[in-house]
């Protein structure tokens, strides 16, 4: 209440002083930045070790309460702290924002003023001023003649006014740290934007089927309200097998449908995804959806299959095939893969034979006692289903741009920012310089400059001595 009783101008002035003299120095503190960076590293490692975006049942199975991992890490701890989606938790995003604020404050209070000072130039007008420079010398009876040309040949930008000279090079080295900070801010902004507006989903689509993006495994708050409205059609799914039966590659012929119209079509495979409007579709899984069969002269009908596990852990797909109109009797059909070979068993588990896609099996000939009447099964088609992992991360362009600028900024930061001053007096020439890195290299450069200046001065005296002689 006291604040609002103050005049508005005084309140704004107090707020500015607090921001400039208290908040900015606190945010720009190197210790705070290092602490936040370590916290981000630890939390990122936690998100790498603990599986992300899994179901509660998964964490209950892998992180039981007894015994607890490391004595404390249980599924309850993981779910309550949000460790199952670390990168989307409010506290992780808050740490990223705080770290970004620290970088921005450091740039405003340190890097930007350093760049502004580096762009200015000032002359040293007194010989005593050269005593503060780490590299300095005095050349009796010499002048500035020829020195600007030598400095320009070495890449310096030279400023001269009368008997005063100032030269600098490597200003890009002062820009580099600022570019590094800007690039890191871009990376942070991209990560934050991706966390709140990106999503991950999984869809299992049978061949010929159409599906929308709806089975989310992880999504930011903005993404849930703005999911893509276009649909995915799986025109065909197939598997290439090697001669020994091993899987060579998985393929899905996909179409993107926008308001019923096909806007893009592409065949994807493992490591070769489809991208559309910032959404990427990866080939991630597969299954068998159903079978199309005929019995004797009946029309073709479609029967769904369900996945089953054997005692050895092998995955099969099974379906009940009725042999009577009232479905009182039937056979169990098992499919081990998409190669089109089905195994038939009776209700007692006795093997009745195998049936290949596009072929038929006369059961009355295989088991005449069990099937006295003519009974022929036709397996017309085994319908596979493609498992797609769908990802959208709108922050990726900013992250990529940030990493690109980061590499450029790091290289720029290695350029030395070097300065040289010179003062001509009645008795001689004062010369001095300094640099922010590569001191040995600059020392050699400075010594070479001094020697060149001495040689130039000596050569300038030869014609004069000849005339005197």
UniProtKB/Swiss-Prot annotation:
One of its GO terms (biological process) is cytochrome complex assembly. It comes from the Bacteria. Keywords: Cytochrome c-type biogenesis, Membrane, Thylakoid, Transmembrane, Transmembrane helix. The chain crosses the membrane at residues 30-50, 89-109, 175-195. One of its GO terms (cellular component) is plasma membrane-derived thylakoid membrane. It is a multi-pass membrane protein. It is found in: Cellular thylakoid membrane. It holds the Pfam family ResB. HAMAP family: CytC_Ccs1. Belongs to the Ccs1/CcsB family. Required during biogenesis of c-type cytochromes (cytochrome c6 and cytochrome f) at the step of heme attachment. PANTHER family: CYTOCHROME C BIOGENESIS PROTEIN CCS1, CHLOROPLASTIC. May interact with CcsA. This is Cytochrome c biogenesis protein CcsB. It comes from Synechococcus sp. (strain JA-2-3B'a(2-13)) (Cyanobacteria bacterium Yellowstone B-Prime).
């Amino acid at each position: 209440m006291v604040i609002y009783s103050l005049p508005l101008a005084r309140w704004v002035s107090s707020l500015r002083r607090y921001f400039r003299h208290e908040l900015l120095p606190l945010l720009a503190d190197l210790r705070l930045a290092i602490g936040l960076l370590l916290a981000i590293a630890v939390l990122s490692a936690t998100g790498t070790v603990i599986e992300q975006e899994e179901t509660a049942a998964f964490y209950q199975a892998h992180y039981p309460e007894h015994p607890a991992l490391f004595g404390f890490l249980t599924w309850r701890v993981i779910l309550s702290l949000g460790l199952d989606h670390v990168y989307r938790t409010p506290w992780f995003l808050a740490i990223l924002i705080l770290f970004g604020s620290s970088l921005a404050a450091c740039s405003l209070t340190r890097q930007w003023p350093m760049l502004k000072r580096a762009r200015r130039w000032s002359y040293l007008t007194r010989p005593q001023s050269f005593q503060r420079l780490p590299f300095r010398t005095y050349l009796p009876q010499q002048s500035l003649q020829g020195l600007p040309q030598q400095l320009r040949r070495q890449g310096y930008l030279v400023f001269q006014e009368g008997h005063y000279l100032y030269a600098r090079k490597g200003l890009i080295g002062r820009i580099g740290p600022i570019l590094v900070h800007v690039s890191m801010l871009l990376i942070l902004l991209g990560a934050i934007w991706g966390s709140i507006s990106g999503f991950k989903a999984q869809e299992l689509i049978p061949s010929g089927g159409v599906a929308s993006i709806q089975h989310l495994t992880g999504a930011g708050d903005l993404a849930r309200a703005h999911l893509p409205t276009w649909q995915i059609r799986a025109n065909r799914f197939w598997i290439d097998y090697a001669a020994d039966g091993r899987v060579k590659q998985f393929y899905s012929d996909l179409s993107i449908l926008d308001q019923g119209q096909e806007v893009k079509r592409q065949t994807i495979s493992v490591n070769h995804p489809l991208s559309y409007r910032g959404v990427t579709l990866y080939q991630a899984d597969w299954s068998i959806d159903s079978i199309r069969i005929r019995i004797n002269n009946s029309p073709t009908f479609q029967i769904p299959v369900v996945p089953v596990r054997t005692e050895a852990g092998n995955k099969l797909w099974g379906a009940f095939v009725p042999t009577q109109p009232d479905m009182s009797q039937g056979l169990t059909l098992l499919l081990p893969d998409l190669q089109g070979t089905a195994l038939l068993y009776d209700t007692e588990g006795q093997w009745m034979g195998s049936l290949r896609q596009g072929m038929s099996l006369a059961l009355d000939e295989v088991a005449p006692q069990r099937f006295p009447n003519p009974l022929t099964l036709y397996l017309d088609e085994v319908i596979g289903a493609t498992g797609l992992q769908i990802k959208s991360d709108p922050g990726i362009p900013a992250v990529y741009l940030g990493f690109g600028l980061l590499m450029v900024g790091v290289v720029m930061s290695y350029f030395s920012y070097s300065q040289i001053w010179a003062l001509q007096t009645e008795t001689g020439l004062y010369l001095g310089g300094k640099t922010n890195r590569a001191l040995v290299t600059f020392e050699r450069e400075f010594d070479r400059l001094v020697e060149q200046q001495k040689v130039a001065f000596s050569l300038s005296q030869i014609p004069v001595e000849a005339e005197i002689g």
